[in-house]
């Protein structure tokens, strides 16, 4: 390393300033990487790792990618969480003596991607920062659209909820995180940058009401400007918001309800977002996800959205016309970002032109729909002046590159027209010269061609060179090929200077004109961003109307007395993936008097789906959308808590039961009377008595403290007696019938409890071996013969009492207990051969077992009983 070259010294100096990035170091037509960067990049990109100075004692690991195809390689690295620093040659090597000056012109990070190919058009690409100082300040930005928002709050739970909702691709912090907080955040993104210094740059944030919000916004904008190193005037003035203005849902609730990502496939398909996305624009699709993540809690704002949806529902033809216009609108938000950023091309501006040309049609259509839409979207503004500029300047199908000419229409610029005319006339002259030379030489295949090395030349194939004397025609030999000779004449050389001079001047002028046009369009940034926001909201609302009409949804109403009444409600996603009309709708009625449903029924009967659909319908309603019911009256929920399904948290080493308890703890701690709690089979991850005790205690706690609307499913049938002690609790069950030993799921929620979970019948549906099914039935029969079964544990007491809810403040008269009696001795289960079948059963027992009592009339039952009695005599 002692004899390191000046170029490598330059590399190492630059690399030391960007040690957390992979440095793409421009050398000619390649971006090269060295040392550890080369090893890492070659592995990730699957490209060859070579060595620089291979013959020396310590060769340097090296790899590289062509500069013209670097974008694809950079995208791969960014998607895997890397940062890439782009180091360009700032001078032309041909015109420089000594070392070429190089500088990092941009740092591309997961949260600052600006190239269209590297982004999903239906997703925001957020970068987020937060600062902790007793409280939290949090700011996030989508650099590609200019969106910038900030908030502050007091607790870590809200921090994690916000990070989950925003789902950033990169996080910037001021100090290192605790291991526990880092672990939780790494579940969302692993790209975390520590940036200790905050500049004193003035970003015009005087309107912010809290110092923490000011500091975290400063931290984020410092980092964005440090990485991008160019104009970012499209980033909007920071908007202050409060997390409490929206319904709260934590990571577990969003995951369990599958709002934007399915649990099994980790994809959009099968989610609420998948169902509701009938948007026509990229901005609308991104706005829809934001609305799903943040349902409203302001009744007036919700009803404003619902009223617009209602107008769209009533006017199908106008809505269909609107959808056609929206379909012609491109991604205005990101096009404006590219204009400001400086990487917009002429085709992008044509997309912008087409987009704003639709605004007058959309506004006229909204005026026809009625006063509500006219008022709601009154700020929709036809940008006629900008449209005229774009219409008069650019050709309809320009090239992708802005440095090759061919961008502008004739008549846009007089000087450009002169250059283009000279170039055009010169090419006409070349065509005439080619015809003249063919006639003069008698060589019909003679042609005049061009390349960047030799300019214009006359080419004659070798077959036509026999007996041909070039000098006689004034031809000077320029190049010899294997099958042809190339010549030039004084006349052609003179004309070449004129033609190429005009072409070069035209291309140079077009580039200058395009830059001026881009800078002019930049002055429309704020107006364009406002139009994009309005169009995105309009797109969401028409999407709500589209799915409502397509799937027969209804307009929800909101009660002031906290009543939840759903008639024939359906799960919006599940019914779409089922065959037509196969979904069984169900009712739900909760109010101040009865706010807990205790739900029993077999596995696979639909308990979890029923609970999920109540939560999802509530979310849809508070988004301002119609809901899948015959009628729906709802309270406005401030929070939704869920505990559904079983999942170990392997990353943190937490068991299924521990995860279950942590989720339950959040609900029990933070729920209010305006919250909704979904508990699915709480307590199943531990022993029977522990689980039963915890489940009962949780129900009693909700009944005595928060009074939150609660749906609680269970297989602990002992809990069904709680309705005698808790007036706020109602037993319901998901019905099923057993017919000839087969279980038939009815999926209908009915009043009352059931005392059988049909576990063995469900196991039979899963095709467990018959020997296991038969053996389980024998054991079950043995258990059911006891007054109350018990497991063989040495610590089983003669009598065990489970306290009721009196511990939470009931008076002596209100106290109750649930007593679980056991025999005077431990029950020792008899042993059987696994492959023994049922105990010997009589024919009468078999007939009784197969009776379908629910479908028999009293008379039929008496006749059957008499028949069985006769057989026993």
Curated annotation (Swiss-Prot):
GO cellular component term, pick one: cytosol
Q: Of which family is this protein a member?
A: Belongs to the DNA mismatch repair MutS family.
Q: What does this protein do?
A: This protein is involved in the repair of mismatches in DNA. It is possible that it carries out the mismatch recognition step. This protein has a weak ATPase activity.
Which HAMAP family is this protein grouped with?
Answer: MutS
Report if keyword ATP-binding is assigned.
yes
Q: Which InterPro entries match?
A: DNA_mismatch_repair_MutS, DNA_mismatch_repair_MutS-lik_N, DNA_mismatch_repair_MutS/MSH, DNA_mismatch_repair_MutS_C, DNA_mismatch_repair_MutS_clamp, DNA_mismatch_repair_MutS_core, DNA_mismatch_repair_MutS_N, DNA_mismatch_repair_MutS_sf
Q: Where does ATP bind?
A: 601-608
Keyword Nucleotide-binding found: yes
Which GO BP terms, alphabetically? mismatch repair
Q: Which GO terms describe its molecular function?
A: ATP binding; ATP-dependent DNA damage sensor activity; damaged DNA binding; mismatched DNA binding
The protein in question is named DNA mismatch repair protein MutS
Supply the alphabetized keyword list: ATP-binding, DNA damage, DNA repair, DNA-binding, Nucleotide-binding
